[in-house]
Amino acid sequence: MRIDDPSNAVSDLALLGLMQLISPALPIGAFAWSQGLESAFELGWVNNEAQLGEWLEGVLGDGLTRCELPVLARLQRCWANNDGDGLAFWNDWLHANRETAELSDEDTRLGQALIRLLNSLELQPQKALGHVELPEEPGYVTVFAWTAHQRQVPVRQALLGFAWGWLENQLAAACKALPLGHTAAQRLNETLRPQLVAAVDKALTLTDEQLGPILPGLALGSAQHETQYSRLFRS
């Protein structure tokens, strides 16, 4: 089947594999990172449920939609086509668009952790089987794309799963650090769920020239988080 055809129905095994990949229980340490959200709390930019919803809408619309989601689609197609040059290009592109040391470190360390897990499960790319090799310093999105491809998850479903995992992680961070009640987190989940679908729809239409995050506030907050006195998260 064509793995990048949005009309493909995801198989039961592929769906279960995607659910495992985006599970909060996946032992890659995603819970330790907030992607700059903790700094937004500390600086007083986000103080309540409504403000958190606005923050997440902004990061989704100006960040994931224009950066991680469309590049994830490109990376998964590179894996499907054994395109090592394409993998290296988009992996480097993502690294170049991590605007602070913490955001870059988060992407790299989560990628390394996922590779270690894949090695333990014997799911890593293997040259002997005809797989193209991982690029140098593969980031999380690059390794996520490999795992989705290896499990025959169609591109659209992989993007939806990635976006869902991002939202779950952000809400979990807010429950710990804002603090936000779990019921409030579920209200935001309900509100933002349709926007995840819209984000994936848009991400799949963007040309290469239209890509690139527009998140100056997130970058400033993340930079200040590096010297924040009291922290729960590594980013």
Swiss-Prot record:
It comes from the Bacteria. Gene3D superfamilies: Urease accessory protein UreF (1.10.4190.10). Keywords: Chaperone, Cytoplasm, Nickel insertion. One of its GO terms (molecular function) is nickel cation binding. It is found in: Cytoplasm. GO terms for cellular component: cytoplasm. UreD, UreF and UreG form a complex that acts as a GTP-hydrolysis-dependent molecular chaperone, activating the urease apoprotein by helping to assemble the nickel containing metallocenter of UreC. The UreE protein probably delivers the nickel. PANTHER family: UREASE ACCESSORY PROTEIN F (PTHR33620:SF1). Belongs to the UreF family. Required for maturation of urease via the functional incorporation of the urease nickel metallocenter. This is Urease accessory protein UreF. It comes from Psychrobacter cryohalolentis (strain ATCC BAA-1226 / DSM 17306 / VKM B-2378 / K5). The gene is ureF.
